Amino acid sequence: MKIGVFVPIGNNGWLISTHAPQYMPTFELNKAIVQKAEHYHFDFALSMIKLRGFGGKTEFWDHNLESFTLMAGLAAVTSKIQIYATAATLTLPPAIVARMASTIDSISGGRFGVNLVTGWQKPEYDQMGMWPGDDYFASRYDYLTEYVQVLRDLWGTGRSDFKGDYFTMNDCRVSPRPSQPMKVICAGQSDAGMAFSAQHADYNFCFGKGVNTPTAFAPTAARMMQAAEKTGRDVGSYVLFMVIADETDEAARAKWEHYKAGADEEALAWLTEQSQKDTRSGSDTNVRQMADPTSAVNINMGTLVGSYASVARMLDEVASVPGTDGVLLTFDDFLAGIDAFGERIQPLMRCRNHIASVTREVA
């Protein structure tokens, strides 16, 4: 099973709590995180894009770096780890994204890929006059389908004459082209999102579910497999989890309860309000899960809380779910968390035995 790190491009990472570590996003912080991840043989690093935060006492995600420029910088200071940036497709023409991706492919030596998002949070785009109207909620994957067709044309042949409802290319050209086939990932959890990933993506991200229920996402992975069967493609799931680990289960649980006790209710209320804006996409979207009150303090990503041994065991359970190709990890404290993962958790994981072998050979 592949392991990735979801780098904190926004302030405070993924904990919406006054009791969580409070920090601003910087290049130096993210460089330290990704270089540590590479040292411990993580397979990939991904950054999201966020253009407007949730506010509240913690000013959650009110402070964000930009994904492509951040990952270009990180590509230049790493050598092995795969690097993924996220394109907010309402803000960037596909021909520009194709050229930026080709540039970072050159910087990274073929280690770069692109995560495509349609955009669900209206205020991110409305503030710039770029929101296309609420009908977009129902048509966003039609838009994204044309978008990725233009990308594939330009990366594959260097030119595009695509004509669609949303994009018109007139002998559009991009050169140089990427040195490797460009990986495209998506985070579709709705039926429409999974159908898109099945047709166009190489991997699909999904949320883990619950606290210490590592296989609860299995129905989502099964839906992705079923969607991919219809297109005859192999599109595996990468699952998002937060790791909160300590020497004992009790110590880790105490940290988790402390974070929950400091939940930033004002920021969470704003998230809930935004999640109700999309009435077109059904009840199975990512944002619906993010705003669920069960564990909104970390936007309801799957959460693994326990001793190092317990977390290793739960991650092995994740790996056992059919259709799972990898996990995307966040941490309550990224620098300490990645060290703990590399030194205390990963060596205990059966699904990462190949990493232990590599480490022994290097030593």
From Swiss-Prot:
The keyword NADP applies. One of its GO terms (biological process) is nitrogen utilization. InterPro entries: Luciferase-like_dom, Luciferase-like_sf, Pyrimidine_monooxygenase_RutA, SsuD_RutA_monooxygenase. Its EC number is 1.14.99.46. Transmembrane segments: none annotated. It comes from the Bacteria. The keyword DNA damage does not apply. FMN binds at residues 49-50, 115, 124, 140-141, 190. Keywords: Flavoprotein, FMN, Monooxygenase, NADP, Oxidoreductase. One of its GO terms (molecular function) is uracil oxygenase activity. It catalyses: uracil + FMNH2 + NADH + O2 = (Z)-3-ureidoacrylate + FMN + NAD(+) + H2O + H(+); thymine + FMNH2 + NADH + O2 = (Z)-2-methylureidoacrylate + FMN + NAD(+) + H2O + H(+). Belongs to the NtaA/SnaA/DszA monooxygenase family. RutA subfamily. The FMN-N(5)-oxide reacts spontaneously with NADH to produce FMN. Requires the flavin reductase RutF to regenerate FMN in vivo. This is Pyrimidine monooxygenase RutA. It comes from Klebsiella pneumoniae subsp. pneumoniae (strain ATCC 700721 / MGH 78578). The gene is rutA.
